Regions:
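Mid-chain, structured segments of secreted extracytoplasmic proteins
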Residues: 57-91
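C-terminal amphipathic alpha-helix
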Residues: 1-61, 92, 96-97, 101-186
Length: 186
């Protein structure tokens, strides 16, 4: 509309779209992570693993795109780089645990958590809404659950992996809604 005047209905539709897009992006991240984990765990051929990992990497762009309209370009670029790093680290963690290399696994976990802290700090630096502990806590809870899922899966504890994945699905919806609210509060 000329002059940027939106009706109440258009504003509400825009808000609804933000929440929906953020939720979908985070759900895709966990679903493609699970698919990648399952392809590694099942010993799928390298071509399949590569294809799934490629699609998993696209989820970093999907999440970044939700933030792109509401953050400066340089910050969006930083966020994308951190999310790509996160996804790549997740893949490496899955492969390392599958190989049985516990020492490297623990080191990679520490780096993964440091990456999540960097994401929380970046968001907090841009938006006071994200400055509290909730941003970091939600991201760390997401990592805790993802780690549990990976460990259960690689230990053949499939029921526990599925149960934790169900809980993770609920958590990322909470995380997505929190992030969307923060973007609106900006």
């Amino acid at each position: 509309r000329p002059g940027g005047n939106q009706t109440a209905v258009e504003r509400q539709n825009s808000v609804n779209q933000l929440f929906e897009t953020m939720r979908l992006a985070w759900l895709e991240l966990i679903y493609w992570t699970r698919m990648y984990m399952m392809s590694v765990d099942s010993g799928a051929d390298a071509k399949e693993q590569y294809a799934v990992e490629g699609r998993l990497l696209e989820t970093a762009d999907a999440i970044t795109d939700v933030f792109a309209e509401r953050l400066p370009v340089a910050v969006t670029r930083q966020l994308r780089n951190l999310l790509v790093e996160h996804v790549e680290m997740t893949g490496q963690i899955i492969r390392t645990l599958k190989s049985g290399d516990k020492e490297n696994y623990e080191q990679q976990i520490r780096e993964w958590y440091a990456n999540a802290n960097q994401i929380a700090t970046l968001l907090a630096d841009q938006n006071p809404y994200f400055a509290g502990k909730e941003t970091r806590n939600l991201l760390l809870n997401y990592l805790d659950m993802t780690r549990e899922i990976i460990e259960h899966q690689m230990n053949g504890e499939y029921d526990q992996s599925i149960d934790t994945f169900r809980d993770l699905s609920d958590l990322v919806l909470e995380l997505a809604d929190y992030l969307a609210r923060g973007l609106l509060a900006r």
